[in-house]
Design a protein with these regions (language model features):
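Acidic/His- and Gly-rich active-site-bordering loop/insert found
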Residues: 1-88, 106-111, 330
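Conserved strand-to-helix beginnings and helix N-cap segments that scaffold or border functional pockets
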Residues: 22, 95, 127-132, 181, ...
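Fold-independent oxyanion-binding glycine-rich loops
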Residues: 42-44, 62-64, 119-121, 150-153, ...
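Short glycine-aspartate micro-motif
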Residues: 57-59, 83, 143-149, 166-168, ...
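Alpha-helical metal-binding/catalytic segments enriched in His/Glu/Asp
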Residues: 60, 80-127, 168-171, 181-202, ...
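Acidic-glycine-rich active-site phosphate/pyrophosphate-binding loop
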Residues: 65-79, 159-171, 324
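Acidic/histidine-rich catalytic neighborhood of metal-dependent amide-processing enzymes
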Residues: 96-166, 228-229, 233
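Metal-dependent amide/peptide-bond hydrolase catalytic core
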Residues: 159, 166-360
Length: 360
């Protein structure tokens, strides 16, 4: 177990900003092929193991990419009781724990058939995330009994995840010279009441499987101009705007589908403007009913929380695989300058995973 910090430092030393995961993928492929493991590659994502011997399958899941480094974390290092480096908490620490568990002969011979899933593209655009293509290319993964996504959770067990939707809500008016506004209809000011309602709309707590998820609507952008989406035709300063668009971001609980989320936005707008849903990511169910989710909760002896954000747990939920978030990383350190993870968190996470994977 003392080798875990060294493994993390080795992972941190590899350049793997989103889009540059080729070297770490090659390193993982060589590492495990050299040990005689079954290795499958999809683009820059690596899947290792899978005996298909009838034991319940547990996926140990982590992404290999990181956001661009800062001067404070460019050079990985051990600093007293912490490991510093870009991606230390998000999520090379989780990947290191997953790898060490996968490489433990006793755990490999235990009650579960372990599969390591190290995928690329999580930190970039949604359509560049390679986990979806991996699950499509390797359909056997979609029959797994549990996926442990080792994103940073501060050593808590986080179940499910919020869904996310972006909708462009466009108010229409009629253009006119700003010196004679009565000859037109101002689309911008027509949106005033809606924006005020949005500003004062309280978060809604929704209980799913005994966990409380907080739904929120947030205006995250706005532009006036012609009919081209995104304000590509900007509105001149001396023209009454004929169109005004607000980007509404809706974070919704796991009890709703994408269609239900879109219907909720339509209910909020109430016919006052047109709506174009431009992006939607489904929520992930908590799946407390799943046998191995219950077993993990019991053996982890950790705080159980809802995931108040979107994670790749949702992708597993879409294909019917029970999944949970658990990892040694500090959520408050993700993407921070000088990113670090406490060494003790590594050891504690390894202990929890080892206890669970060893079985009752």
């Amino acid at each position: 177990m003392s080798a875990l910090p060294d493994l993390l430092l080795e992972l941190l030393a590899m350049p793997c900003v989103t889009g540059d995961e080729g070297p770490i993928a090659a390193w993982l492929e060589e590492r495990y092929a050299g040990r005689g493991e079954r290795v499958r590659r999809c683009a820059n994502s690596i899947v290792v193991g899978g005996e298909a011997d009838g034991r319940p399958v547990v996926l140990l899941v982590g992404h290999t990419d990181v956001v661009p480094p800062t001067p404070e974390d460019l050079h990985p290092r051990a600093d007293s009781d912490r490991i510093v480096g870009r991606g230390a908490s998000d999520m090379k620490a989780g990947l290191a724990v997953a790898m060490e568990c996968f490489e433990d002969p006793a755990l490999r011979a235990g009650p579960y058939d372990l599969v390591l899933v190290a995928y690329a593209g999580e930190e970039g655009a949604h359509d560049g995330n390679e986990l979806g293509p991996v699950l499509t290319a390797m359909p056997d993964l979609t029959t797994a009994d549990l996926a442990v996504v080792m994103e940073p959770t501060d050593l808590t067990v986080q179940l499910g995840c919020m869904g996310a939707m972006h909708a462009e809500v466009t108010f229409r008016g009629r253009a006119a010279h700003s010196a004679r506004p009565w000859q037109g209809v101002n689309a911008l000011t027509s949106a005033g009441r809606f924006l005020d309602e949005l500003h004062h709309l309280a978060p809604a707590d929704v209980e799913v499987d005994g966990l409380s998820y907080r739904e929120v609507f947030t205006a995250t952008g706005a532009w006036s101009g012609g009919p081209t989406s995104g304000g590509a035709i900007p509105n001149a300063r001396n023209v009454v705007p004929e169109a005004f668009t607000v980007n509404v971001n809706y974070r919704f609980a796991p009890d709703k589908t994408l269609d239900q989320a879109a219907a909720r936005i339509a209910e909020l707008v109430d016919g006052r403007a047109s709506i174009e849903v431009v992006d939607g990511a489904p929520a992930g169910r908590p799946r407390r009913d799943a046998t191995l989710v219950g077993a993990f909760i019991q053996m982890a002896d950790a705080a159980i929380e809802p995931k108040q954000a979107w994670t790749d747990v949702a992708r597993f939920s879409e294909v019917g695989v029970p999944a949970l978030n658990f990892g040694p990383g500090l959520t408050a350190q993700a993407h921070q300058a000088g990113e670090y993870v406490p060494v003790q968190n590594l050891l504690d996470a390894r202990g929890v995973m080892g206890t669970f994977l060893a079985g009752p």
